[in-house]
């Protein structure tokens, strides 16, 4: 069973169909349910992932259906602005969705993984450290410590925790950028090409099937970082 957060985002929507070919998918969205997506092995669930109680209640409700779980923490949010201008509410929102939700989903799914003697935790991060994205970058840096801790504490149960760090990809989010910003991002990539969702799926498939890759961070950005 694959548990995917961020199912309504650009990358989430584009990888769901291929993920459903690997296993059944519990696709979690935070705001609006994706339209025109009907796949045999995918069920969509609305969960406010900034609310610890909602996450716990969701896992409790689905626990009887969960076995051999791969958790893919994809959900993320960014609020642009210089750090000195950030309100505490904005900071806490970014941290709760980008970092705390990863901890909470891991925390509540690990007992199931321990029982199964198998589990995969994949945190999706980013190489973005642009000016004006300080809270986003800080939250994603926090994933490094979280993933390392999980990898060391639960390896003996055949549970792995790894990070995939993404560069610029050919998704709806990229195409919403201005032509100037598109060029800025593309100029960072030596090949001048956008990443494809198949690159992400290859990494996910690799991590699901690799029991000795643990605590690692895999960068998929075409050499831009």
Label each PLM-derived region with a short phrase.
Residues 8, 16:
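N-terminal Rossmann NAD(P)H-binding glycine-rich loop of SDR-like oxidoreductase domains
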Residues 74-80, 223:
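Conserved NAD(P)H cofactor-binding loop of Rossmann-fold oxidoreductase domains
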Residues 82-83, 90-95, 174, 185:
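Substrate-binding pocket helix/loop in short-chain dehydrogenase/reductase
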Residues 106, 139-142, 147:
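Active-site helix of classical SDR
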Residues 111, 152-156:
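Alpha-helical segment proximal to the catalytic Tyr-Lys
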Residues 155-160, 213-216:
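Short, small/polar-rich loop/turn modules that mediate ligand/substrate recognition or access, typified
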